[in-house]
Amino acid sequence: IIVDGNKTSGIESIIRDLKKHTKITNVVSKAHGKMAWFETPTNLDLYKDIPTKIEGGFETQAGVFSSDGVDPASKLLAHFISQDLSGTGADLGGGWGYLSVKALETNSISELHFVEADLSALNVARNNINDQRVKFYWYDVLKWEAPKLLDFIIMNPPFHYLGRAM
């Protein structure tokens, strides 16, 4: 089986996850991509899109941004965002939901619109964010329109589209 992908699309975390389950024959890295191959296993059930638990009890999934743990920029933002947010807001490009969970630790947020273009990340975020105040949107943040005026926006850019930072 040959696995090929862009580094910005999460191929490195996918290959890292594969190494936990099978012996990788070889890995080739060129420009912004990587390719790995391995012998076809007898049982392919291990390779289904199954979320994994990380530090803090969060779930992530191979292929989504920062699937191995919370990235340093998000940790820094989380320290500040929960202090002054109130009213209705949005988490644009929320990934698997870390910043939203941290923001929702305050009771002064009445409603949070969680917008994510990556369906795998959105599905994992639904598992991580168990809060009635959140509405989930599978949408490109460049095209999403807020249903009403927002009091705040949470973002940790850049976002990636077709391998380019936006």
Segments predicted by a language model, with ranges:
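S-adenosylmethionine
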Residues: 1-47, 62-84, 94-166
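A short, charged helix-loop
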Residues: 50-63
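Class I SAM-dependent methyltransferase core
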Residues: 91
